[in-house]
Amino acid sequence: MTPNIHHDKILILDFGAQYTQLIARRIREIGVYCEVWPWDHSPEEILSFGAKGIILSGGPESTTSPGAPAAPQHVFDSDLPIFGICYGMQTMAVHLGGATEAADKREFGHASVQVIYPDTLFSGLSDHPSEFRLDVWMSHGDHVSRVPPGFTITAATDRIPIAAMSREDKRWYGVQFHPEVTHTLQGQALLRRFVVDICGCQTLWTAANIIEDQIARVRERVGRDEVILGLSGGVDSSVVAALLHKAIGSQLTCVFVDTGLLRWGEGDQVMAMFEEHMGVNVVRINAASRYFDALQGVYDPEAKRKIIGNLFIQIFEEEASKRKQAKWLAQGTIYPDVIESAGSKTGKAHVIKSHHNVGGLPEQMTLGMVEPLRELFKDEVRRLGVALGLPHAMVYRHPFPGPGLGVRILGEVKPEYAELLAKADSIFIDELHQADLYDKVSQAFAVFLPVKSVGVVGDARAYEWVIALRAVETVDFMTAHWAPLPYDFLSTVSNRIINELRGVSRVVYDISGKPPATIEWE
C-alpha cells in the first residue's frame, strides 16, 4: 500500500527571501513534504493545511519600517512548532514582545556563532566541539535587540549578541543566520532537528514513494481516457512522458515538434529514447520549414520568441484535434512555477513572475490538465527521471531555452545559421564531456553572431562568421559567474570549430557575469 507521503508536512510562510525555495528543497531532501505560501495567506487555509510545523522565511524588508510584513497571530495560536529564519526570527521577536534594531551596516557572509545554551535545536551540533561554535552564513541588516518574554538567548556572534533564541515550552525557535545554504555547515542538521525531532515528521518523501503516489493519482484521474503530451526533449517533459507511460501505457500519446531549432541530432535522440527503447507512442512532426518561413526577416528577439511559441501552439493544436479520444493534456509544470504564479491575496507578498507553461496553450482546448510534477522542484524531477530509468546524461544535461536556437542566433534566423550553430554547440559540449568539465559548469552553449570577420584560408583572405562560446557557474541561475575554463581547452574547441565547420573564421569566449549580462544572449 502506498504511504500517504503528504501526511507529515511543513508549511513555509514566505516573506520574500531569495532563499525561500532553497529552504523547501532542503526539507524535501530530508524526506519531508513541504509547501511555500505567501506570509499573508488566509488564516483558515493555513490552519486547515494540516502542517506539523511552520517555518517563517527570511525577507528583504526591515521590521523597523512601518507596514513591514508581520508574522500572523494565528500562527502563534496554532500550538505548532515554529522556526523563524533571519527576517522570520525578527518578525517573531517583534510580534511576541521583543525588539529589533537596524545595524550600522549589513552583515553578509561567513560568521562564527557561539552556542550559549544548547536547546533542543542546537544540542550536540558543533563545527568546533570544544568551543560549541557553528560556521554559518549571515545576510541581514536588522537584528534582534531584545528577546520576547519567556525566550532564551541560545547563540551569539562577535557582532550581534542575539544570533538565535528559543522558547522550548512553546517549541518556538529563531536563528539570525541561514541554515538552508551550504555555507552553514550544520544547516541541514538543524533543519532535520526541527522537522524530524521537534515536529515529529516521518521521512516519507522519497523518489520511489513519489512515483508510486503519482501513478495512483494519474490512473484515478484519467481512467481509460487518452492523454496527450507536448514532448520537447527537455528534462521536465521527458520525466512526465516516462512517468505517464509507466502509469497508463498506450493511453499516452506524445507530440514531438521538430522545429529545426533543436540541439544537433536531438530529434533522433528523442525518438530513439522514447519510441524505440521505451515503447512510448510518439508522433514526430517535422516543422522546420514552417518555422524558418515564419522567422524570415524577423530580427527582434521578443518577436522571435512569440512567433516560435505561437507556432508551437498552432501545430500542437492541429495534432491534438486529430485525436478525438484525447480528454487530457499533460504538462511539465514544476513547483517553482506554482510558487511564482501564486501571488498573494493581499498583494503584499513577494511575487517573482507570472508563469505560462508551454507558451500558454489555447483556452479553447477543452482538455483536462494533468501535471504530475507540479509538486516537485527541478532537482527532485531529475531524481525521479533517474529512478524511472531515463539516462543520467538526459536527465542532468544543461538547460535549453524554449525557443531553442532561435534565441542563440542573433538577429534573423536562417536554416544555414541554425545548422552551423547546432554543429558548433555539439563540438563544444562534446569537448566538455571529453575533458570531464561538463558537470563542473552549470550551463554551456554556443551563440551564432551574424557578423563576418576576416580570416585567412590558405593564402587568401576570407570573411566568415563568428561563433561565441558561453559557460557559466551558478546555483540558482538568478546570478551567475562566467566559467574560467582552461585556455588549452578553449583552444581545442576553437580549433575544432574553425577546422570542421566551413563558414566560421573566429571563435570568442564570453566573460560576462549575470548581472549585468543575462545568461542567454537574447
Swiss-Prot record:
Ranges where the Glutamine amidotransferase type-1 domain occurs: 9-204
EC number(s) reported in the record: 6.3.5.2
Pfam family, one: NAD_synthase
Catalytic residues as annotated in Swiss-Prot or TrEMBL: C86 (nucleophile), H178, E180
Top-level taxon: Bacteria
Domain GMPS ATP-PPase as annotated: residue spans: 205-397
GO MF, one annotated term: ATP binding
Pathways involved: Purine metabolism; GMP biosynthesis; GMP from XMP (L-Gln route): step 1/1
Residues binding ATP: S232, G233, G234, V235, D236, S237, S238
Assembly, per entry: Homodimer.
Protein name: GMP synthase [glutamine-hydrolyzing]
Native source organism of the sequence: Xylella fastidiosa (strain M12)
Lineage of origin: Bacteria, Pseudomonadati, Pseudomonadota, Gammaproteobacteria, Lysobacterales
